[in-house]
């Protein structure tokens, strides 16, 4: 005799079917849809490993939205759960993750992680994820991802902050990740800045008195810099990683792009190569399989707005007085390290640090050698708070 139960998680597209065979003592979880860290944490509560019962998880129709969900699979497999129909890219990632954890065991990414949202000034639902340490955090790091990214890519980063005693929150910019808005389009970069302003304000209201650091990656660094120029007293420090201030395109091409944005603002004209983000093949495979960025191309207006924002920032750097940490890889093909160098040289801050990583690609925190970059960031935050 066998029976099956079909159900969905509230407000999600993940479908679970539980099949139990009374005669064999086997329970099969058949999954379908998009799986992220939040859904993985919920599934964990459903799976129990019993000496009298074998548990199988069928992954034939699953698409993984972030690394944390794949990391969850590594943990349940280690507990005796059998994975069937596991995609090859997931299997390779799990093998690499297991090997890494033998040297550096990490905490469960689902612990103290929450997904939430707020409403933007123009009525959009803006999604963000938060991670908290046990007890009062020493500080909070608000993370602004760039293009070809979203908050789900910062689970490992958040784990490191939590291990160091810091809380972390990462936003999905409008039109990206799980947030509302036309996909990958923004009318004005000021809309991004308004969303980050609301995001930081919300973090401060939830963690009163806790120093806040803003970490922006690539285009997220441009947004973070724009915010910081107007709200320096709100932040304990600004971290710009792979700052998209200077782009690998000739000036005449950027001028044409700005002109085209007035004629065809919604035309999608640029597709960034995931292979240029990381030297880690497992990271690239995960990006290629991520439905939230799988078909990401940038509209003319989004790109033109970033160019205009960069032009404005070039005049604003001398006004920057808050502590700055600027990070860039020398082999970055998506943004130029010379832009970070210029920011460092012209910023008015007395407390500023520039670190260039030889041979590193665009996404320093998703690249080979990310542990060194992460240690530099947490060490810098520790030092800033010590001097405060």
Where are these predicted regions, by residue range?
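Catalytic nucleophile-loop/oxyanion-hole region of alpha/beta-hydrolase
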Residues: 148-151, 177-207, 373
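Short beta-strand/loop motif that positions the catalytic acidic residue
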Residues: 320, 326-328, 332
């Amino acid at each position: 005799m066998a029976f099956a139960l079909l159900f969905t998680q509230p407000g999600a597209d993940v479908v679970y079917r539980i099949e139990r065979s009374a005669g064999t003592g086997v329970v099969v979880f058949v999954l379908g849809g998009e799986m992220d860290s939040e859904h993985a944490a919920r599934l964990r509560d459903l799976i129990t490993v019993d000496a009298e019962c074998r548990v199988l998880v069928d992954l034939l129709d699953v698409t993984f939205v972030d690394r944390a969900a794949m990391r969850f699979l590594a943990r349940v497999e280690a507990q005796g759960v059998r994975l069937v129909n596991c995609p090859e890219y997931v299997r390779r990632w799990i093998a690499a993750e297991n090997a890494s954890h033998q040297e550096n065991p990490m905490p469960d990414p689902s612990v103290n992680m929450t997904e939430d949202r707020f409403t933007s000034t123009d009525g959009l639902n803006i999604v963000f994820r938060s991670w908290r340490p046990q007890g009062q955090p020493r500080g909070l790091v608000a993370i602004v991802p760039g293009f070809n990214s979203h908050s789900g890519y910062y689970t490992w980063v958040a784990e490191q902050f939590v291990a160091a005693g810091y809380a972390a929150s990462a936003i999905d910019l409008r039109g990206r990740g799980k947030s509302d808005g036309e996909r990958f389009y923004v009318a004005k970069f000021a809309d991004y800045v308004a969303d980050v302003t609301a995001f930081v304000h919300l973090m401060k209201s939830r963690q009163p008195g806790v120093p806040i650091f803003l970490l922006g990656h690539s285009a997220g660094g441009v947004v973070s810099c724009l915010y910081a120029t107007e709200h320096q007293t709100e932040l304990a420090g600004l971290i710009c990683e792979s700052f998209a201030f200077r782009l690998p395109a000739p000036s005449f091409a950027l001028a044409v792009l700005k002109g085209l944005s007035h004629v065809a603002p919604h035309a999608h004209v640029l597709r960034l190569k995931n292979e240029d983000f990381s030297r880690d093949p497992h990271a690239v495979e995960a990006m290629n399989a991520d439905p939230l960025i799988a078909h990401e191309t940038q509209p003319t207006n989004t790109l033109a707005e970033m160019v205009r924002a960069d032009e404005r920032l070039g005049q604003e750097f001398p006004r920057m007085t808050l502590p700055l940490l600027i990070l860039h890889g020398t082999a970055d093909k998506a943004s130029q390290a010379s832009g970070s160098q210029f920011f460092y040289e012209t910023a008015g801050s007395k407390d500023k640090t520039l670190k260039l990583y030889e041979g590193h690609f665009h996404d320093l925190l998703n690249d080979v050698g990310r542990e060194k970059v992460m240690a530099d960031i947490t060490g810098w935050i520790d030092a800033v708070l010590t001097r405060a």
